[in-house]
């Protein structure tokens, strides 16, 4: 179908205000000056959608924003980055979510007002969009309280017409680490947690062990471990890959750029090892600028970085 999406993202979108420098707040009405402040695309789903579009995929985004400045900002920024936002619903009763990121070079603290983030549900998603997607990704599973109970039926529907599925759970603010997710694993083709999320969801302390346990139920499990790279499991086979070294300014959105790279490579038919290498390169390159989207690479940049790495071996 000429108007099909390679990737349809169902998820969270909200602006991120990223502060850099001496970002530890001091209460007692003390004012501190930080080095930088940037308002940019935030929300795991929106960052992933922008990253996948940058890599050349045809991407649609479905989410909910409020009828306010932050919602309009998100729509305009995603459109500017080549994402189809026809599925971005405006809720006139609630505010768009917003996140403040206190960013250090290799770590960050995140403060989020959820706003409309949790309001996405099946009835707000155009069925024609789902039917026109090669792959459907759900971001921030634990934040999407209204969508998650409906995902088993939704995934059954999209897989019945040949689409593949993926989920990035992201952090569980309640730290319960289930919410129906374990039961959904059997319908997830690619499960994309980070190291902490994988070990908490599997309830196993060691990453390799956790990934293998999750892979007994999900198709492929790919766990991000930051500067250590990533671990993937398919059946009983475990693959590890280290990321290329770059000068990191801000790791915000690196995991989402990683996801975008993995899915783009997988949808191109690449083997798991290559998808892992491309994902690692996308994650690493995305840390070169403040915020989640401004340093997201093109596929040419990724392949150049990987060829330099191969030449240096």
Label each PLM-derived region with a short phrase.
Residues 2, 129-133, 185-186, 215:
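A short, aliphatic-rich alpha-helical micro-motif
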Residues 77-93:
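A glycine-rich helix N-cap at a beta->alpha junction
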Residues 13, 141, 257:
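Active-site metal-binding loops of divalent metal-dependent hydrolases
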Residues 90, 101-145, 149:
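Conserved phosphate-binding/catalytic loop of the ribokinase/pfkB sugar-kinase fold
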Residues 135-212, 228-230:
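Conserved beta-alpha-beta core of the PfkB/ribokinase-like small-molecule kinase fold
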Residues 1-64, 69-80, 248-249, 313:
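Glycine-rich phosphate/adenosyl-contacting loop at the front of the ribokinase-like
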Residues 1-8, 33, 157, 207-313:
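Conserved phosphate-binding/catalytic region of the ribokinase-like
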